[in-house]
A protein has these predicted regions:
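Small, basic N-terminal interaction modules of short regulatory proteins
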Residues: 1-4, 58, 80, 98-99
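Arg/Lys-rich, positively charged N-terminal/basic patches that mediate binding to nucleic acids
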Residues: 1-34
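Alpha-helix N-cap/helix-start and coil->helix boundary motif
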Residues: 12, 38, 89-90
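Residue-level recognition of specific faces of alpha-helices
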Residues: 14, 40-43, 60, 85
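Generic structural signal for secondary-structure transition and capping sites
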Residues: 20, 27, 42, 46-49, ...
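Short, hydrophobic secondary-structure boundary micro-motifs
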Residues: 31, 52-54, 95
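Basic/aromatic recognition patch in beta-strand/loop cores that engages polyanionic ligands
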Residues: 39, 46-80
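Enriched for short, Lys/Arg-rich terminal
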Residues: 73-99
Length: 99
């Protein structure tokens, strides 16, 4: 099945904040982070069922190299994948449920 991927506005903020943080630590590291996230978005788009449901119909794809999970939901009725957020794995999981 072919899906369309939709990003909630907060996803862009998550990526920008994390990019800025990594760049403040090591020049160019933020760019590497963004590249890893984009690659994971491609995997989600082409193989969303690869990731199991973790909570409230939400699946989590973990990035390689960086400790982040991409939280998304598959909407079968519209053939859409909605990316809800990008969270550091050490953050309080209660934050996930608030979005």
């Amino acid at each position: 099945m072919k899906y369309e991927i939709i990003y909630l506005p907060l996803v862009y903020e998550d990526i920008k904040e994390t990019n800025d943080f990594y760049n403040s630590r090591v020049k160019g590291l933020g760019k590497e982070f963004v590249a890893v996230v984009k690659e994971e978005f491609k995997t989600i788009l082409h193989r969303p069922l690869l990731f199991e449901i973790k909570y409230k119909n939400t699946r989590i794809a973990y990035t390689k190299r960086f400790p982040f999970g991409i939280h998304f939901e598959i909407q079968e009725n519209t053939n859409r994948i909605v990316v809800k957020g990008l969270y550091h794995t050490a953050r309080n999981s209660e934050i996930w449920y608030e979005r």
